[in-house]
Amino acid sequence: MGIFQSIEEANNTSERLLRSEIKNSHGEFEKFDFDTEEYEINPKRKLRLVSRINPNAGHLRKSKSCFTVDEHVDETRCQKPVMKSPFMSNVDDEIKKKRETITKMTLEIEHHELSQNIRKPTDDLLPDSTYQPYHKKMLKQENRMIQSDIVNGENEADRLSLISDRLGMLNWEVTLQKVTKINDPTDENEMETKRYQTKELIDSMLHKFESMKKKSRNLARRPASSDSLLKLVSGKDWPKIYTRIDRTFIPDYASSSDEEEEKITVEEIRERRLKKREQQCGGSIIVLLSDHQSQKGMTRFAIVAEPLRKPYLIKTSTKERNSWKNKVPTNPKKFKKAPRISTQIAVKRRREVIPLTMEVEPEVIRDIRQDTQKSMKLNVKAEEISVTETVKSKEMNALRNNAASISPTLSEKAPLGSISSCTASQISQRSSENVGAIINNINPNLAIVPSCNEKTFVKTHNGMKTNSGINILPVRKKKKV
């Protein structure tokens, strides 16, 4: 009972660990121990085959050259027998026995036809839905464990790299005693050798870790089962193959359909597969090379570029050269003479300033620019017309004002009754007489205008009031036609 109680207490107190960490009783990491051998047979050391023992004959043999058989003698001549056992005198019997054992190992394949028993669909007694939540829980736990392993690996790599750096410092003896197991710290030879061993071991571990990280990155980039997809892709879906070329892939050819090629020679198989590749990807290119030492017109070497293969150099035979030369006339001509185009010669139209930076102007921008230029020209013309109209309107207003100032004098000189009772001829005569009288009554100071040039007059009287109180309008220059 006491034993069972202690076991139960241990089970209750001890926690279940998902990953084991190698630590000693003090809670420190285990030290490197180079005194005790890790393996019985060192995997890094190369094995050397000293001798071979024939189980049937029981003789020690160095090599095949030592084992000789005479035509008239059936006994084997070799080294002295090490082990006493019944040994065979005839080599043919040994070969026969080997053949018998090999024939016994062959398996006879029996062909069975599967009977098509159509079963009625029934309800699943153990559906997957019952285990779905547990499966999700374990998946999450597994992902957490993987992430924790990655973090622990990174931390361990950092720790080892720090130790290797400290071993290169002046106080490397202190770090070496903490990391490796040393029998005598005062022995300089032991300290130096173990320092070199620890550094070499740490560097190898870090190198393995980096290579593992690189491989994991490459596997993450590569899509799952990419090779299997390539083998199942049909010949029509070539863009997928050209993104990542698989030279071993043959279109419309399964690995199990080689029964047709059993009775064909290797050269015929190569020609057959080459024709398939040429049908899908295009023909191969052959470039004949001439050698200076050979006769003129004779080509001894050629560069061959087949589809989905790297180009290679071959030494041509007379048969190959003749076959290629016969194919040359059937090929299309390389160059064709094209006639000169009429619009090829440039004709000088106008001279334009080209900027230093040449930029291609799109047609849309060019049309917009032309429209804006036209609209600007139209706006300028409209402004000019409006300016002329305003000037004319101002002149007309000034004339009307002058006429209004003159009209009271006319009313004073001629009464209304006399004007209404007069005829048209009389009115015209009187108006002419009145105008002459008004001109005579005008102040002579106002009528006199100082004689000056047109430019000076415009500058002095451009929209300014003179001493006489008359507002002089600006004079507009006449444009040359």
Swiss-Prot record:
InterPro entries, per database record: Cullin_homology, Sas4, Sas4_dom
Known partners and oligomeric status: Interacts with ASF1. Component of the SAS complex, at least composed of SAS2, SAS4 and SAS5. These three proteins constitute the core of the complex and are sufficient to acetylate histones.
Function: Component of the SAS complex, a multiprotein complex that acetylates 'Lys-16' of histone H4 and 'Lys-14' of histone H3. The SAS complex is however unable to acetylate nucleosomal histones. The complex is involved in transcriptional silencing at telomeres and at HML locus. Also involved in rDNA silencing. In the complex, SAS4 is essential for histone acetyltransferase (HAT) activity of the complex.
Coiled-coil region(s): 90-120, 139-160
Gene name of the encoded protein: SAS4
Disruption outcome: Heterochromatin spreading downstream of the silent mating-type locus HMR.
Note: Present with 800 molecules/cell in log phase SD medium.
An annotated Gene Ontology molecular function: acetyltransferase activity
Ranges where the record places region Disordered: 319-338
GO annotations of cellular component type: chromatin; chromosome, telomeric region; nucleus; SAS acetyltransferase complex
UniProt superkingdom: Eukaryota
GO terms under biological process: subtelomeric heterochromatin formation
Signal peptide start and end residues: none
Keyword terms of this UniProt record: Chromatin regulator, Coiled coil, Nucleus, Repressor, Transcription, Transcription regulation
Cell compartments where the protein resides: Nucleus
Name of the protein described by the UniProt record: Something about silencing protein 4
